[in-house]
A protein has these predicted regions:
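Phosphate- and other anionic-substrate recognition elements at nucleic-acid/protein interfaces
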Residues: 1-165
């Protein structure tokens, strides 16, 4: 089984069977919190654990996109990106789920994609026509699916708990 994780707040988790068939596609669980300035969203960490826990102990290979700072990105934005990535890695470690990190340029190049999110969505729709990717904003779902597909196609065999590539 391969699980693809696009780790942003408005992203997704895709679960593929050992044959590469889509088993589940989940939006990242988030909480909306009230603040003195309005509201903000953050990761629902217990929700992340509940989402991944059923796959613990199975022959599972998790592929997570490696988050990195981008040129011109603000300090707060960089912090949020790293914080979210760290939460995901912490959840995977706590659940003892083996994982591989991959930079966006690596997996996208391997699948013949560029930086365009719409191209990723269209490619995912070709590979998985049953997936609900109709909206342009479903690029996070599409990228999670493609990360899982990349793992299934390129990295092959599952790993054992505690192993990391």
């Amino acid at each position: 089984m391969d699980i693809g994780i696009d780790p942003g707040l408005s992203r997704a988790v895709a679960v593929l069977g050992i044959d590469g068939v889509l088993l589940a596609l989940h939006d990242v669980p988030i909480l909306t919190l009230s603040t003195s300035r309005g509201s903000r969203t953050e990761y629902d960490v217990p929700g992340l654990v509940a989402l991944l826990a059923p796959y613990r102990g199975t022959q599972t290979h998790v592929i997570i996109e490696e988050s990195q700072a981008m040129p011109g990105q603000g300090v707060r934005s960089m912090w949020i990106t790293g914080y979210g990535y760290g939460i995901w890695v912490g959840v995977l470690a706590a659940l003892q789920m083996p994982y591989t990190t991959v930079r966006p340029a690596i997996w996208k190049r391997a699948l013949g994609l560029g930086k365009d999110k719409e191209a990723a969505r269209l490619r995912a729709m070709q590979l998985y026509p049953q997936a609900d990717l109709r909206r342009k904003k479903d690029h996070g779902r599409a990228e999670a699916l493609l990360l899982g597909y990349y793992g299934w196609q390129r990295l092959g065999c599952p790993m054992t708990a505690g192993e990391r590539r």
